[in-house]
Amino acid sequence: MKILVDENMPYAEALFGRLGDVQTVAGRAIPAPALALADALMVRSVTRVDGALLDGSRVKFVGTATAGTDHVDEDWLAQAGIGFSVAPGCNAIAVVEYVFSALLWLAQRDGFALRDKTVGIVGVGNVGGRLQRRLNAFGVRTLLCDPPLAEAGAPGDWQPLETLVAEADVLTFHTPLTLAGRHATWHQVDEALLAALPAGRIIINACRGAVVDNAALLQALEGGKPLSVVLDVWEPEPALSLPLLARVDIGTAHIAGYTLEGKARGTTQVFDAYSAYVGSDERASLAALLPPPAVERIRLRGAIDEEALRLLSHLVYDVRRDDMQLRRVAGLPGEFDRLRKNYYQRREWSSLCVETDNSIGADALRQLGFQARPFAG
């Protein structure tokens, strides 16, 4: 079997090599000759998968090592009889920790306590649900908005977006991009929402760029609207708005979900799905793939307060590093994608074991995603 895999999927060449002949390709420019000979295609969100790409090929299976599927025409794949697999939740923890890193940095810079803020979460799926649980574990009040889940009768204290706009200090977006329908998310943050948003609010977008009307946001910021803005995704990509980047507080190159664990989960999930599809018993072990982290263990004494959490969070991942790197190269041809392709081995909080003399603090850290254990003395 001939298997094409995106060159930025970690461990993909070795894993899929167990099942066939592997060729790595650039996701934004898959060579037509390679595609013509492929039996399977493994992609990320940068590849649009539809009839224009695959019609006439012999591809029988597509896997996307991403949680979202708005880059895939699933209806066309089904009609063409092509198998399909996605990696739900693969990078959810990474995005949650990106949001925490950004909020803890803003709290330090602006002199507020995160526990004193109300965070409005728009989209309460794999990412939003995990974010809610971690924020609540840290004592932060959350407001939840997810109309499709509310209509489906899912348990939760669901609120309309207007309530979040009025009451939440932070609005963080974790929805798919949907262009039509009653619950379309395209330009969910538009000129009207920005006008209604009280001064001093924080907006975070780490889902899809077009959920926020970037032109309207730039106009609001240039007009003096006092907002703090964190953008990991842009409209469009990779040719993001340089004037908007200059105005936001944190800007990064669509890397919120780019932990080594998150990317490896995406690869292993689609590998397992394809292996089952072709009738193989081969399965991937995430733990066996991951290398030791740069910092494996740290010992703390005393209470685990917000400052301690900020230091621990930023020891593992400090969002300012990615902000600095994007600003350094923004506007240079190919550099947005180069940052993503050559992204360093960022780890998740679970890679760090915190030893503490505070048993209550150890429990809290475990709820937040760290390894933690008490010590005496």
Swiss-Prot record:
Single Gene Ontology BP annotation: pyridoxine biosynthetic process
Catalytic activity: 4-phospho-D-erythronate + NAD(+) = (R)-3-hydroxy-2-oxo-4-phosphooxybutanoate + NADH + H(+)
Pathway: Cofactor biosynthesis; pyridoxine 5'-phosphate biosynthesis; pyridoxine 5'-phosphate from D-erythrose 4-phosphate: step 2/5
E.C. number: 1.1.1.290
Keywords for this protein: Cytoplasm, NAD, Oxidoreductase, Pyridoxine biosynthesis
UniProt-annotated catalytic positions: 208, 237, 254 (proton donor)
Keyword Cytoplasm in record: yes
Taxonomic superkingdom: Bacteria
Range of residues in the leader sequence: none
Entry's Gene Ontology cellular component terms: cytosol
Compartment list: Cytoplasm
Principal location class: cytoplasm
Keyword Protease: no
Function: Catalyzes the oxidation of erythronate-4-phosphate to 3-hydroxy-2-oxo-4-phosphonooxybutanoate.
Family: Belongs to the D-isomer specific 2-hydroxyacid dehydrogenase family. PdxB subfamily.
Protein's name in the database: Erythronate-4-phosphate dehydrogenase
Organism encoding this protein: Sodalis glossinidius (strain morsitans)
